Amino acid sequence: MEHHLKIDNLGPIKHCSLDVSNYMVLTGYQASGKSTIAKVIYYFRSVKDELVAVMMKQFQSQDYSTPLEDALRRHLMEKLYRTFGVAAVSVPGMKISYSYTKDIWIHISVGEKRKNCRFSPQLKDFLHSLDNEYRTGDVHAKLSEVNGLIEYLAKKTKEFNLLFNDSYETIYIPAGRSILTLLSSQWNYLYSTMDDAQKSLFDECTRDYIENVLLLKSLYSRDYERKSLDTLTDAHLRDLSKKADTLRNFILKGRYVCENGTEKIELSNSSKVDLNFASSGQQEVVWVLNFLYIRLITHRPSYFIIEEPESNLFPASQKYVTELISLVVNAGHASLVTTHSPYVLGAMNNLLYASTLPTDKLKEADSILSKECWISPDCFSSYFVEDGVVSDCIDHEIKQIDSSKMDAISSIVNDEYDRLSMLMWDDKGRNV
């Protein structure tokens, strides 16, 4: 069963009900609510991580006075405010719900007088049994041992993955990345000097992104990518890593390096440019590429929520970044992409089309578009967000994104051009 999401009256979204597929794209006008949907999905898919955080906090404080169910509920409500802002989640009639399976779900709603966070009966039963388990003497004694807590939480994480029907780590990559990249050399200092109140000025998704970037940057400074490649023994994954690296170089026009804390782009002629002096396109896309590539070569199944991967990129690079995302998805990961770009949507359609060709044409198709990047229609979905509602924009007959969603503005521009060109001719067809 796929995860299922419902939203009512949250921000610009009036109503939304959709299945969360393995590979999904949201398109539509700016400020239509694409990011709102993406953030709600991130919020619910990170519940299992929040459960681990709540358990860790209770153990470290040795305060078990609050039942785990109540502690998690309180934690999720606080995160709701940090993710969407108090005003957005205080509107009477606001509802968000997420079904992981038919038996495991979470519903959050706002009434006239109170907010309500409900867990399904089976989820409540699981939390109660977990509560009883890790408070018992035997388990508690093991947790006090060296590495005991880490081993216990690692075991529980696998159980949570099964419970929530989700084996992926969720990574949110927001839009507006260039300013964060531009300041990256100062982030370690700036972030370490902020108190909790100052950090709360960032929405939860942006804050998580910053922390993930800082962590990955520290790994790159220790040559983590090369070491990961050196230990990669899976032949198929090594082949995919080479193809992914080729696409990455096409997009970035170089290679990201971090030397003594200084981030640079190493160009093809071996010269290096400090990242804060690189192009806006490179600054926007560099961490998209780094996250995709590292998770690919370390084979850590991830659910990538990527906002506007096309930002500040030339159309050819938009095509390549779409192919890279698709390659990574096919390697055992998953992704949600928000986009305004007809080039991204067009590239996706080509990859969908390639996978549906007759068997005797697949070899030729592979020579045009690498089969590792093809998109299976069975695991793909696309939605158009407009006027607060979401509509399926897949043409199910041909199994592609409805071309009218991509070509709407082109037809307007072409019509305007035709009308302007007509002004150059008089009623008798003579050029004026």
Predicted regions mapped to residue ranges:
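Catalytic acidic motif of RecA-like/P-loop NTPases
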Residues: 11, 24, 279, 310-314
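Amphipathic alpha-helical domain-onset/packing element
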Residues: 231-254
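GG-anchored amphipathic helix commonly corresponding to the ABC/SMC/Rad50 NBD signature/C-loop
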Residues: 41-44, 270-306, 315-320
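Helical segment within the ABC ATPase nucleotide-binding domain
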Residues: 318-330
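C-terminal structured domain segments
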Residues: 364-401
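P-loop NTPase switch/coupling surface
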Residues: 1-205, 346, 352-373, 391-392, ...
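Loop/turn-to-beta-strand initiation segments
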Residues: 301-303, 332-336
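H-loop/switch region of ABC-family ATPase nucleotide-binding domains
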Residues: 338-340
